[in-house]
Amino acid sequence: MKTYNDLYLNTRNMLKRSGVEAYAQEARILVACAADKTVTQLLRDLNLYTTPAVENTVTDYLARRLRGEPVAYITGTWEFYGLPMKVNADVLIPRPDTETLVDAVKEVLVGYKMDARVLDLCCGSGCITCAVGHELPATKLVAVDLSASALEICRANIAMNRLSSRVICMQADATASPPLGIGTFDVIASNPPYVKSGEIQTLDRSVRDYEPIWALDGGKDGLRFYKAIIKYWKSLLRPEGALIFEVGENQADDVCDMLMAAGFASCAVRKDARGVERVVIGRI
């Protein structure tokens, strides 16, 4: 019988040989999930013996990972802004880059409009909604996505993070007119699809083959959703409101130009932790 440390080392070595960059971290996550433990608990129990059931589960997880499936989809959970998030193949896996968007929402609202009404457009898993709701406990939020299956995950995350009393989920198309009665907002935050259609096939296979293409494909120029959201949703902003976008690399200038052409008073750009221009803030 193997110890948890044996299982971890074997998993780590297999991932390393297969070229997985974060092989040690991923090995810990996979073994911990298979054992129904947190990573902290796993590290505490490394010298304890595992069970055949756990070993079989790790073998299955490892095979899936070596085929390219992302760890988040294997475990069904991921962390965003310090919060637990359920994920599956119906939603994009939350990225650290998107935490810059949450930071921008806080920058706009903290000390100015703590009880703001915030719209999360193209909400996917609801990670932005949950993070903003957790960080700004007086806000009221609306989470919108076209995908019914994504909204199921969003609702589950809202409930898991105890935000159901402050969040409404709605199904709507970000590239069309807003539904009647949705109201107005102090902030509209959006991480829309922004990968150029022609670049989808160049993405890493863990993204290209497993994450939902419709949540990645931003049209021929990657800007389709930005154009539509500015056109159709700008009218929902309250006076002095802000439209805050996550953008792809080298898209910030184009999106700022669109905002200014649409009559926004100002446009600011914020960089992510890697120094990439990741967020654009348009102010009415």
Segments (PLM) and residue ranges:
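C-terminal beta-strand of the catalytic ATP-binding
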Residues: 194, 283-284
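Conserved Class I SAM-dependent methyltransferase catalytic core
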Residues: 220-283
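Mobile active-site "lid"/loop adjacent to the S-adenosyl-L-methionine
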Residues: 194-224
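Active-site beta-alpha loop architecture of Rossmann-like, nucleotide-cofactor-dependent enzymes
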Residues: 72, 195-198, 250
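Conserved hydrophobic residues forming the short capping helix/wall of the S-adenosyl-L-methionine
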Residues: 15, 109, 158, 233, ...
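Non-catalytic accessory regions of SAM-dependent methyltransferases
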Residues: 1-43, 47-50
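Conserved SAM/SAH cofactor-binding pocket of Class I
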Residues: 97-202, 227-228
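Conserved AdoMet
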Residues: 32-108
